[in-house]
A protein has these predicted regions:
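Active-site residues of response regulator receiver
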Residues: 53, 83
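Active-site beta3 strand of CheY-like receiver
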Residues: 45-51
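Short hydrophobic/Thr-rich beta-strand motif most characteristic of the beta2 strand and flanking loop
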Residues: 26-33, 41
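C-terminal output helix
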Residues: 107-116
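Charged docking surfaces used in two-component/phosphorelay signaling
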Residues: 16-24
Length: 122
């Protein structure tokens, strides 16, 4: 049975690129446009990993991760943050919220797949 990954990003084109790479690697994918959309799509669904942008309208990625970690069923689900910002303060904030990995945009799909496989496969 394939593992399911949720991609949360306000850029439809980025979601598409990530989705194609993940599906090509054998993962099932759910997409959401922001944190609010993501929380709604998680209702009654089990995902094994979440990839979330940091800067999004409505609910940013760090707020989304904080809300996600309040949900018992997702407390230990790994999260990879995507961002154009690579500052240490943002990284610390994301890690404090519960993110396990940080990928700076632009990135190559292979780079993302290494991080995904590392967090999903153990």
């Amino acid at each position: 049975m394939a593992k399911t990954i949720l991609i949360v990003d306000d850029s439809a084109s980025l979601r598409q690129v990530v989705s194609i790479a993940l599906k090509g690697a054998g993962y099932d994918v759910i997409e959401a446009a922001d944190g609010v959309d993501a929380l709604a799509k998680l209702n009654g669904v089990k995902v094994h990993l979440i990839i979330s942008d940091v800067n999004m309208p409505t609910m940013d990625g760090i707020t989304f991760v904080k809300e996600l970690k309040k949900l018992t069923s997702y407390k230990f689900t790994p999260v990879i943050m995507l961002t154009t910002e690579c500052g240490d303060d943002k990284k610390r904030e994301g890690q404090a919220a519960g993110a396990k990995a940080w990928i700076v945009k632009p990135f190559k799909p292979d780079q993302m797949l290494v991080a995904v496989n590392k967090l999903v496969m153990p």
